């Protein structure tokens, strides 16, 4: 069960959660979420999830792989955070965690009662909207917050007009 949202209570701000990864659609989700947060006096949380299954079965090498994954996560988050600050003028919160994406997203939402909307972006692949969107859609009942999926074809102007 997901905890009660506090984002509309005194002393709290509504947070928009964007998932950060190496996919091109990730940037569209961040663009929408950051503009929505700014235009509604909310906040932005950027979540990078490291798939720990990639290095669990390698003894000494697993620690090196984990450290490299964390370095990539920090670098990616730092770059996106800088872009958001420069372009939109807000400073996002950043979180790095390890595990299965849908489970970690649910945990972060449950732990932070100010997170009120999960923002994802659909990919342009002929195979569908992307593995993250498909995974979240299959676990939709696990989230007690709205999930907004940004279509691939939205231009910057379109995003500006709907945020």
Feature names for model-found ranges:
Residues 84-88:
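Short helix-capping segments at alpha-helix termini
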Residues 92-94:
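Rossmann-fold cofactor-recognition segment
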Residues 48-75, 157-163:
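Acidic, proline/glycine-rich short linear motifs
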Residues 1-5, 110-163:
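Gly/Ser-rich helix-loop-strand patches that form or flank binding pockets
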Residues 96-104:
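Charged docking surfaces used in two-component/phosphorelay signaling
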Residues 10-60, 143:
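Small/aliphatic-rich secondary-structure junction motif
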Residues 28-32, 107-108, 135:
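A short acidic, amphipathic alpha-helical/loop segment
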